[in-house]
Amino acid sequence: MNIEELKYKILQQFGFPPTPEQAQALDVFVQFMTDSNPHAVMILRGSAGTGKTSLSGAIVRTLRAVRQKVMLLAPTGRAAKVFSLNSGMPAYTIHRRIYREKAFAGVDGQFNLNDNLYTDTLFMVDEASMIANLGLGGTTFGSGCLLDDLIHFVYQGRNDRLLLIGDKAQLPPVGEEESPALSAAMLQGYGLSVYECDLNEVVRQSQQSGILFNATRIRQMITHDDITQLPKIRFSGFSDIREMPGAELIEALGDSYHQVGLDDTIVVTRSNKRANIFNQGIRNMVLDREEELESGDMLMIVKNNYYWMEEERKKIKERQLSEERKVKSEKFNTLANHIVQSNEVPAFLANGDRAKVMKVSRRIDLYGFHFATLLLKFPDYDNYELEATVLLDTLTSEAPALTHDQQEQLFHKIEEDYQDIPLKADRMKAIRQDPYFNALQVKFAYAVTCHKAQGGQWSHVYVDQGYMTDDMLTPDYIHWLYTAFTRATEMLYLVNWPNTQIEG
């Protein structure tokens, strides 16, 4: 298919005339797709409200219609869910597609870079601003540098190429000053031929949105290097952005939970300490929760966990073997193969994944810590259900997860139970397989930090920036504020917003 044919087919999928910037981006995309260079890559940078989502959706629908193979990826489960809803086809986490488990070693699994068996495939990665390359998470996954591994994976395939989609005004990955996956210079360093385009103009249908009007103003402070005073927010004339006095917050949150649900409402704040305060207040005063943890509570995983998914895979395999022994017919074997696929479990539970408590079945105090056995449902993984042991101590701690000292304390207490195993190597192996040592570390998910919310979208978003003065103004704060604002799709509430930051 030539350039003009591909461009015409994508335009047909738009449903409305593209903006000049969208048309230019489309020109770049069709050139990228028809380039014979096997090492071509494209970056599509677009800010909130500029039509990036509608453009990528039209591209996906067109490529599927012309039978061009496409794989949709995103850095987190929530981001993959949003990408899937916006494009109309399944999307997966990057980790789930590019890594395979080498060996389960208890707390820290070991995942190697997978072989890329895809051919003639376009890998489209949304929310690429979140892709890190510093290796802060150690080497549990491949080289420890996600961007390195993603590029290596894609370009080891035959005639595969990569389209990175993201917003450079959002928070960059932790420890990095900018998002490496959205940098043309960074990608050229891999020997890739880079196509790039930017969408900056807010499309007409977005101009009536107070969320996008103010987010655009904040973004322009970044692009124009005009970070000299705290931004003033315009509320008047808009119905989708509101000041939220603290005295009205409890009632407003209750209304949001009633209107759009617990899973589509979020409070975004600046620290784990503030998130804890909000979570306790919401549970006690809005949801009337009296127990430490109850059915219906929303939780967030705060440390990667590999053990429980490995246990799930073992259970599924055992069930299938048991059924196969009962019935050996060809008809059943076909059914069994279908069951294997339909029960595909996530490779691991990632820091930031959200879960709903369906049942609290057992509580126990052991080793100086508090545990519970829960039935959990994961809304970002097709409502996958899992029974697991959860560590309750992290629910209200100010630290992001168990501290190093607490982890050491838990390890040594559990080790005492395995003193009958003489060889240290065997003893370590047994501890790493212990369900309490591998208990899920969780926090309540009604209020989260902005890094935890990044990649997701919620109908109702409440933003708490805490106390701010001009002296505390940094580029990081402006990126934080922009990222927090753009999590909202319907209503944005600014909690206890100071008069000095309101446009008069």
Cite the ranges covered by each PLM segment.
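Conserved helicase motor core of P-loop NTPases
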Residues: 3-6, 29-30, 37, 154-160, ...
